[in-house]
Amino acid sequence: MADLRKHKIGWIGTGRMGFSMAARLLKKGAQVAVYNRTRAKAEPLAPLGAQLADSPAALADRDIVFTMVAGSGDLLEVVSGPKGLLSRAGRAPKILIDCSTISQEASAEARGAAAAAGCAMLAAPVSGNAKVVKAGRLSLVVSGSKDAYDEALPWLESLGEGVSYVGEGELSRIVKICHNVFLGVVTQSLAEITVLAEKAGVPRHAFLDFINKSVMGSTFSRYKTPAFVNLDFAPTFTPVLLRKDLDLGLAAARKHEVPMPLTAAVRELVQALIGNGYVDTDFAALLALEAKAARLELKPENVAVGDGLYT
């Protein structure tokens, strides 16, 4: 087992995902100092052993620094802004690892700034949410310097159960964008067929039980079953964030001349979801929008169903 105390770790961004990932590193024994724009969101990590930093720049002396922020502008601010990680001449971590879902262009800009400061950068976006992190089921896709990847691998592996290296540069960014496009399209499709089955008389829990046991069942369909059955839309990933990722996918499609009509349609449905007030809920609320369009009144079924994360 690798010694996770070999390098000092910095962590920038303790939202839902960043908090859970930093907490996992701490529980695995890593030495972690954390920064978050809203300090109160980072403070609960202190009892786990985290040091609290007052700015990203204060983490420049760490060996490896992870970032997990909401978007492209946020990453560039915490990396290259006035108090950014690389704002002090001659001070930079050895490796910067960004786990956010951002554009390839912003990632390349951050990578260039890191290289100018003598810092290697890995793009390492993730598949999962805070609950998945807690269950140890997070997956990461990584691109960048192979040497930096090999050095950082013990810390990457400690975050979850799967790490995939796909090559140099920003290749992992397009992989993650495609992943989240798939997430949106699959969720909309699952919402449509669930509403169809229920309106025809099949209880949601019975329909999804069959789907999950069939060849079409998946980790994801099982994970979203409790939300669909009992209408618990507590946010794991919001419609606003999904809209951002669908926009990234459509921008990449235009760049590479790839038609994506399903993605374009789902993007507008997510926009409608937001317009109907589903802003701080889970994106599984696409089910509610579909039911409304079908004039189906949804009610919680109050059936105990598993999410497949724990066996």
How would you describe each model-predicted region?
Residues M21-A22, K41, A110, W155, ...:
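Hydrophobic residues within alpha-helices
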Residues T101-V181:
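Rossmann-fold dinucleotide-binding core
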Residues P56-C119:
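Rossmann-fold NAD(P) dinucleotide-binding segment
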Residues V32, L52, M121-L122, V163, ...:
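Hydrophobic beta-strand scaffold residues
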Residues M1-A60, I64-T67, K94, L298:
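NAD(P)+-binding Rossmann beta1-loop-alpha1 motif at the extreme N-terminus of oxidoreductases
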Residues E151, L171-A294:
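Helical "substrate-binding/catalytic lid" subdomain
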